[in-house]
């Protein structure tokens, strides 16, 4: 899996000061995407053991609330296995950190997807919050917290999986 960058002090992609892993590759090509450079899966750098160490070191600070995974698209079939391994490692090493994930798919679509090995459900099961839905330029709303358009939802992933229905983290 390739990634574009690791942002170490982000306040726009989840609650608190966060580390953001921007993965490469997205087949959705949403019009108006603010990360068009991340759509090509071959863009950026290979995520290696050194990248993992950098990520853990960045997260292991008392003022960092957690990790956000965005892109590109973390749930692309060619990213699922690696993203799962990364989230599993973060959960094990730093269990108090929250994990947010952005997906262009609706929650219901993501739960039905098949990626071969690791499924999107496996990845989502390690997340606290999932922001779902493709960016829609005609629904752009800069007043919304943590998302760009009104069709996107901020979902409490753990409670939604438990109740088998979407439970919003916030409106």
Q: Where are the regions that the model predicts?
A:
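Short glycine-rich, flexible loops that bind phosphorylated cofactors or substrates
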Residues: 76, 138-139
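P-loop/Walker A phosphate-binding loop and immediately adjacent motor/lid segment at beta-alpha junctions
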Residues: 83-91, 140-171
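N-terminal [4Fe-4S]-dependent radical SAM core
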Residues: 1-22, 27, 35-42, 166-167, ...
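Conserved Radical SAM active-site core
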Residues: 2-3, 17, 35-120
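Short cysteine-rich clusters marking metal-coordination/redox-active sites
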Residues: 30
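Receiver (REC) domain switch/active-site residues of two-component response regulators
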Residues: 128
